[in-house]
Amino acid sequence: MGQKVHPNGIRLGITKPWISTWYADKSDYANNLNSDWEVRKFLVEKLQAASVSKIVIERPAKSIRVTIHTARPGVVIGKKGEDVEVLRAAVSKLAGTPAQINIAEIRKPELDAKLVADSIAQQLERRVMFRRAMKRAVQNAMRIGAQGIKVQVSGRLGGAEIARDEWYREGRVPLHTLRADIDYSTSESHTQYGVIGVKVWIFKGEVLDGMLPQIEEPKQQQPKRKPRGK
């Protein structure tokens, strides 16, 4: 059976940046890696209502800088920035170094694979029909400007006795093209029948020489040539 490589992992260092960017000695590497995992776990649990897409961690000069990419920055910041200060103190305590927290707003959540997957998972938990949730996500992404999207749900769909998976795709999703800007993420929906897995692939365009994704022009059809002698 055909197995697919992780779309983000294969593009690291080519078109995708790492979500942890720091250098460390051999003796500190494991501690830093474990610290990153604990910080991410804490922030994801703390900011469940904030539509967090990803958390980027940097470690400049004996400190830690955390950038939270979210579609709802107001929820993270809180009233007069009080919530950010609480988060900063907690992250500093977890990491054991001075912490700085930056907020990056996601202006088009319909084009973010993690947010789309979480949205579908939440709808399934509210007993929305899975086909309706999938089709709505696909239509929204294509309307906003995606060049292609694929959504897959797996599990006891609709409370069925036998688990299965169903997928829906629109546009192009070229997984083998390394220069293609493919955003991929997963989520889980915990229903009364069990866990339903959600996978989302979004194709935003092609990255050329580190430039922003280029929107391809539709190809014009060549006029048919008439046979000679007619």
From Swiss-Prot:
What is the organism lineage in this UniProt record? Answer: Bacteria, Pseudomonadati, Pseudomonadota, Gammaproteobacteria, Alteromonadales
The record's annotation in HAMAP family points to: Ribosomal_uS3_B
MF terms from GO for this chain are: mRNA binding; rRNA binding; structural constituent of ribosome
> In its UniProt record, which GO terms are filed under biological process?
translation
Organism listed in the record: Shewanella sp. (strain W3-18-1)
Alphabetical GO CC annotations of the entry are: cytosolic small ribosomal subunit
Q: Which family does it belong to?
A: Belongs to the universal ribosomal protein uS3 family.
Mind telling me what this protein is named? Small ribosomal subunit protein uS3
Q: What does this protein do?
A: Binds the lower part of the 30S subunit head. Binds mRNA in the 70S ribosome, positioning it for translation.
